[in-house]
């Protein structure tokens, strides 16, 4: 732990680590934004809907310093990836796209870190393409069965056109900030600059983003993730914040993972909410280090 702490203290900031941004076409009109740093062993990070690569800025530098090549992949409709109006935004379709992007990047047997809804994609990827995944760390993200959450469905109850009239950049930032605060333990990290960073991909294409969100609200999965979790054989670690928050991983989801996965552990992070990589980044880096050892 002392060596890890020293590494973190001496790690370059995210902005100081040279980034390679590559937009990868995975299908006609479907482009995924990838951001890579470092040259070591591959570590793939999948964000939630908001945040993009920016949401991992506090851990990518330290992880590169520890010898990893970090690769943030933003799923379709997330962050700066494209927001096609008629695409399939189911988690299953997103999983296929992520695997396509990784194939084009030449990545195999990577560690994965996924936050929030990104974890639902990562779970499926580890089942669909075990050759790509050697270990998975979920940051407060459970085995969600659908991208069409009750909140999404409610937001688009009256259709996307009305939403476009009601939501501008300022309104989006306000709503995202409110949700981040509700789902955080220590909220001091939630500044105006951070909220702008978390929403930059969406505000760059407001109309397209709203179209994508509406499609997510109507997405359907072809089969159940719960019925296939037993096929996931790599080590899986779940980090959860101890501060109660609306988007937390439910007790039923935790029990399901514990029952179905052969190598599963949960770590509770005191004082944190959903955004552990923001509130306690050193805990996430330490968890990645332990996962790296367990997956060899």
Model-derived segments and spans:
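Catalytic active-site module of serine/aspartate enzymes centered on a nucleophile-bearing elbow/loop
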Residues: 261-296
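Conserved alpha/beta-hydrolase catalytic His-Asp/Glu region
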Residues: 148-153, 167-230
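Conserved HGGG/HGGXW glycine-rich cap/lid loop of the alpha/beta-hydrolase fold
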Residues: 30, 35-80
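Active-site loop/oxyanion-hole signature of alpha/beta-hydrolase fold enzymes
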Residues: 17, 27-30, 35, 75-117, ...
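Short glycine-enriched nucleophile-adjacent loop
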Residues: 119-130, 136
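Conserved loop-alpha-helix segment in the C-terminal half of the alpha/beta-hydrolase fold
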Residues: 236-272
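Flexible "cap/lid" loop of the alpha/beta hydrolase fold
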Residues: 127, 136-167
């Amino acid at each position: 732990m002392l060596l890890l702490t020293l590494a973190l203290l001496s790690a370059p900031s995210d902005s100081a680590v040279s980034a390679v941004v590559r937009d990868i076409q995975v299908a006609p009109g479907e482009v995924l934004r990838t951001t890579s740093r470092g040259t070591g062993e591959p570590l793939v990070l999948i964000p939630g809907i908001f945040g993009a690569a920016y949401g991992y800025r506090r851990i990518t530098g330290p992880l590169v310093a520890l010898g990893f090549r970090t690769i943030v992949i933003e799923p379709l409709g997330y962050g700066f990836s494209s927001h096609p109006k008629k695409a399939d935004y189911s988690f299953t379709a997103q999983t296929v796209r992520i695997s396509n992007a990784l194939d084009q990047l030449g990545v195999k047997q990577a560690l994965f870190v996924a936050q929030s809804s990104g974890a639902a994609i990562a779970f499926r990827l580890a089942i669909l393409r075990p050759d790509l995944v050697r270990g998975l760390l979920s940051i407060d993200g459970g085995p969600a069965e659908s991208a069409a959450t009750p909140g999404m469905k409610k937001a688009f109850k009256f259709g996307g056109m009305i939403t476009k009239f009601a939501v501008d950049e300022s309104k989006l930032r306000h709503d995202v900030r409110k949700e981040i605060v509700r789902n955080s333990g220590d909220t001091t990290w939630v500044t105006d600059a951070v909220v702008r960073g978390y929403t930059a991909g969406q505000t760059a294409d407001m109309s397209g983003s709203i179209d994508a969100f509406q499609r997510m609200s109507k997405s359907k999965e072809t089969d159940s993730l719960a019925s296939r979790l037993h096929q996931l054989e790599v080590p899986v670690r779940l980090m959860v914040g101890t501060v109660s928050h609306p988007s937390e991983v439910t007790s039923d989801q935790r029990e399901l993972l514990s029952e179905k996965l052969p190598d599963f552990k949960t770590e509770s992070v005191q004082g944190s909410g959903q955004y552990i990589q923001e509130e306690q980044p050193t805990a996430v880096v330490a968890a990645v280090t332990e996962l790296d050892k367990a997956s060899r």
